Amino acid sequence: MLHRCSRVLSQFLGRGNSKMLREAYSTSLHCVQAQEGMSVSPDVIAKIEEGYAKLQAAPECHSLLKKYLTKEVVDQLKDKKTKLGANLLDVIQSGVANLDSGVGVYAPDAEAYTLFKPLFDPLIQDYHNGFAPDAKQPNTDLGEGKTSALVDLDPEGKFINSTRIRCGRSLQGYPFNPCLSEANYLEMESKVKAIFDNITDPELAGKYFPLDGMTKEIQDQLIKDHFLFKEGDRFLQAANACRYWPKGRGIFHNNQKTFLIWCNEEDHLRIISMQEGGNVGQVLERLIKGVKTIEKQAPFSRDDRLGWLTFCPSNLGTTVRASVHIRLPKISAKPDFKSICDGLKLQIRGIHGEHSESEGGVYDISNKARLGLTEFEAVKQMYDGIAHLIALEKAA
């Protein structure tokens, strides 16, 4: 099969010099080779074993990868490969390169969650509040018909600057970043752009801005709006998630700048609803409308056990991150502030995203749980936690 495919594709490609066709050929050939049982190379196995040794020899490393990548797991998985050719090194390389990682692993494709489950399952159970290997993600419940219960958390505007709810989605039929070809990126971008162009709902309708060839004027405006995402940080770079940048990447936003979609950043799609103030119900209602509009035309990858599939296992399940930018000057100065948030199942970040610090006394606080609960429950976890923090701040 391999030789026949190679000969036919070579003859086809010989008729032209299309870079995209050659890229598609390269990816197809790689997949055929993987399916025909080609083993993981000795060089890759050596790098896997070196990575394991590096983690074990690093006392400053406290990642979940280090905790669950035992010698037994290495020996069990080091020679395994998904149908798309991804191996254990693809899973662990970011955590090996960045010893300060919290999680340290990424899934190069959907099959990785099954093939490398001796590593993923205990790690997922640890991160996602005891989500056991035999547990199943509940059916999707975005909160339709329930959003009116989420009244404004801060009607006087004393604490909350803005509210944001996002979810990630992966398109069916495509792997995750490390296994995507340039042709894949461009094809996905073309598909979702066509969907964006057909949105007629006045609350959602807007414009798509591709990163490739973006003018300085548009770039400056998107930076001013805090919409522009940059090429991946060192964690994503090390995971091989930024290939062919900026091909196939872009940003859609509605005319009111309250609904935003990132195309091929960390996940295939990041769907975001946001606005100033603390009206969580309004933000969620808009997100529901947006997700429903997109999924009618683009099927998403969902697993019966793990829910909506994403590149990073921290986002599995609902993929929902509901957050506020909030000022809590009194209680945030207390040494047990993080412990209080942990007890409320809340996660603290700086306002510039993951791995950033607080700025000007403003914190980005969100639900921590993504897996093992419904989408609405994830939002409600943030809502109830923030209400409690505001009450503590008022009483301090």
UniProtKB/Swiss-Prot annotation:
- What domain of life does the native source organism fall in? Eukaryota
* Protein name (Swiss-Prot/TrEMBL): Probable arginine kinase F46H5.3
The residues that the entry says bind substrate are 102-106, 266, 312, 354
Keywords from the named record = ATP-binding, Kinase, Nucleotide-binding, Transferase
Reactions the enzyme catalyzes: L-arginine + ATP = N(omega)-phospho-L-arginine + ADP + H(+)
The molecular function GO annotations come to: arginine kinase activity; ATP binding; creatine kinase activity; kinase activity
Q: Does the keyword Kinase apply?
A: yes
Its Enzyme Commission number?
Answer: 2.7.3.3
**High-level lineage:** Eukaryota, Metazoa, Ecdysozoa, Nematoda, Chromadorea
